[in-house]
Design a protein with these regions (language model features):
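Transmembrane beta-barrel wall of Gram-negative outer-membrane proteins
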Residues: 181-282, 300, 304-324, 563-566, ...
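A beta-strand signature from Gram-negative outer-membrane beta-barrel systems
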Residues: 80, 114, 127-173, 215
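Short acidic/polar hinge/loop motifs at secondary-structure boundaries
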Residues: 85, 96, 112-140, 191
Length: 615
């Protein structure tokens, strides 16, 4: 199903609504009432939305978000009870409910499901700025009108509507800060303006934020046995990070005389992580636990100027209107996501260069290592240039239809959703390709780009230092081949079709209500790639890396029936008891089920997908 075909489905619905709408008679306006909306009222509306929700949910308003210096929605959601956030270098990225795996959480904008950018399933929230949100509903109990993959939680991000404020409105925010370590800048700017009258309305917004920081890592890797662990490797790493987040979009609405609306919404977000890494590694053989001295060790060095891009683009055409006694919602969406990594790595390998080596790792966060000289004196006989690349690019056409009405028992609601997804890319999670000719040290000598020692309060007796990686990268671009492409056996080629239908009935009682429903999801999944042909003898890294490949195509179809029941009992005017039973489905991610494998020449490891995984 392509976007144009989805549009053809929606156009007759819009024409029907216009034909019904034109039958309404114009009415004279006899009175104009102007309403103001205070911050307290906005927060009270969020509280009331939580109380009246048919399921267990947490609701946070835009005004509540604005009281805190949150850069993205992960920080904001982390303030809600029962929700935890996972961080990367101190910054919030993933969201999970009640300690469950983050893959059990799904996300949507205005009810439109967004595929996980990194792997098609798991959503990231660090690219979603707070300015776009009018209200965030974190559903902790899942009803049948929510995606089946929402096992532990479903987060619906509601963006601003033009009709939220009559006439013109304008909002802006500017923030500045500074990191304690390294003095990195923190900036935040956003702007939003809207206009609406009785006939039409529009809202447009833009947002940008940056975070600069230095991340100081010490990472010992252990061997040996429990209680007698010895260090195999000790890493001294420093990252100079600049993260940028940009978003822009808007909504145009045409209001119908029957109270409905036709709307076009655009949402575009982009998160860019620019990361300089300087990584010095000490290797020890046959060491002793905790402390040791008198060893001869080996050194390796990695340095790079990497770029990670995380992008979501969504365009939705929809209609909401009453038709007779029914409330009808229909939406067709085009959703594109991009996850791209480019990391050209200078990888220098030595052996036995570190003499009179001693170490003390009693504090793993601050290991102490000494040897004759410092890292500025170390030379490396092997100098490689490695392209670490990864990417997942998805295109989704989605059609969603929901209809509901009141009946003698309460409310009846049912709907249908169709998703057609294509995922391409490669190098999951990273492909490493050694650039022909190795590292051109005669032209781009790293010694010519040395800077000062690590800015760190920790021990740095080894003399780990910074390199001007961006300038060094510019030099490399003048002499090296262009960015490597994904190897054929690491390319991702996936097509997936999801069809879902649901029905749910709310039974109103004197003491509360019961909501019972059934959701049926049908999945068709196909992946094309390569697998390793049979290799005789030792199946080691070298054999696999050089082994013959053969084409593999796998197609699977399965159907899941997902019932749910929710009970809401009013114990008192300000107390409610909620009991829920729901079922869900955890599909393998595109990375886990791809017909491809990635070979890492740095760690000498292989990671591959399994297209025969079951849901």
């Amino acid at each position: 199903m392509k976007f144009s075909k989805s549009l053809l489905v929606l156009i007759p619905i819009i024409i029907l609504i216009f034909s019904v709408n034109t039958q309404s008679q114009d009415q004279d306006i006899e009175e104009v009432i102007v309403y103001g909306k205070a911050i307290k009222e906005s927060q009270q509306a969020a509280i009331e939305a939580k109380r009246s929700a048919p399921n267990l949910a947490e609701v946070i308003s835009a005004d509540a978000i604005g009281r805190f210096p949150d850069v993205n929605l992960s920080d904001s959601l982390g303030r809600l009870p029962g929700i935890s956030i996972e961080r990367d270098q101190g910054q919030a990225r993933y969201v999970s409910f009640r300690g469950t795996p983050k893959r059990y959480t799904t996300t949507a904008f205005n009810g439109i499901n967004i595929p996980g950018v990194e792997n098609g399933r798991i959503p990231r929230f660090d690219s979603y700025p707070t300015v776009i949100t009018s209200q965030v509903v974190a559903n902790k109990a899942i009803t049948s009108d929510m995606p089946g993959e929402s096992i532990s939680g479903f987060i619906n991000i509601k963006t601003f509507k033009p009709s939220d404020v009559d006439g013109w409105s304008f909002a802006t925010e500017v923030g500045r800060g500074e990191q304690d370590q390294g003095g990195g800048d923190i900036t935040k700017e956003n702007i939003r303006t809207s206009y609406s009258n009785d006939d039409f309305g529009f809202v447009v917004y833009g947002s940008s934020s940056t975070v600069e920081q230095i991340t100081d890592n010490r990472e010992p890797t252990y061997g040996g046995t429990k209680g007698a662990q010895t260090p195999d490797r000790i890493d001294f790493r420093s990252y100079k990070v600049e993260r940028e987040s940009e978003a822009f979009g808007g909504t145009f609405e045409k209001y119908l005389q029957n109270g409905g609306r036709i709307f076009l919404t655009s949402l575009n977000t982009e998160f860019t992580d620019n990361e300089e890494r300087n990584d010095f590694r000490v290797y020890v053989s046959d060491g002793t636990p905790t402390t040791g001295s008198g060893y001869t060790g080996s050194a390796r060095r990695l340095f790079n100027d990497a770029t990670y891009i995380n992008k979501t683009e969504m365009l939705t055409l929809g209609v909401e209107t009453p038709i007779g006694e029914w409330d009808v919602e229909a939406q067709v969406s085009k959703i594109d996501t991009t996850f791209d990594t480019y990391m050209p790595i200078g990888y220098f390998i030595g052996g036995g260069q570190l003499t009179n080596l001693s170490y003390d790792i009693s504090d793993p966060q601050n290991p102490i290592v000494n040897f004759d000289g410092t890292y500025r004196d170390v030379d490396y006989p092997v100098k490689l240039l490695v392209d670490a690349i990864g990417g997942l690019y998805t295109e989704t056409d989605q059609f969603k239809f929901d209809i509901s009405r009141e009946n003698s028992r309460g409310q009846l609601k049912f709907g249908f959703q169709y998703d057609d997804r294509v995922a391409t890319g490669g190098g999951a999670t990273l492909a490493t390709i050694s650039v022909s000719g190795g590292y051109p040290a005669d032209v781009c000598n790293p010694k010519d780009y040395r800077l000062g020692d690590f800015a760190t309060p920790r021990n740095n007796d080894v003399g780990a230092f910074y390199t001007d990686n961006p300038a060094l990268n510019e030099c490399l671009n003048t002499v090296r081949p262009p960015r490597s492409d994904f190897p054929d056996d690491e390319k991702i080629n996936i097509e997936e079709t999801l069809m879902a239908a649901y029905i749910m009935q709310t039974f109103d009682m004197e003491w509360g209500n019961i909501i019972a429903g059934l959701r049926i999801e049908d999945t068709e999944y196909q992946t094309v790639g390569f697998r390793l042909a049979t290799v005789s003898g030792d199946i080691g890294y070298e054999n696999i890396a050089a082994g013959a490949k053969e084409e593999l195509s796998v197609k699977r179809t399965y159907t899941n029936y997902l019932p749910s029941v929710h009970l809401n009992y009013d114990l008192a005017e300000d107390k409610k008891l909620r009991l829920s039973y729901s079922t869900g489905i955890s599909r393998p991610s595109y990375i886990e089920s791809r017909a491809a494998a990635s070979i890492n020449s740095i760690s000498e490891s292989i990671a591959g997908g399994n297209p025969f995984l079951k849901e």
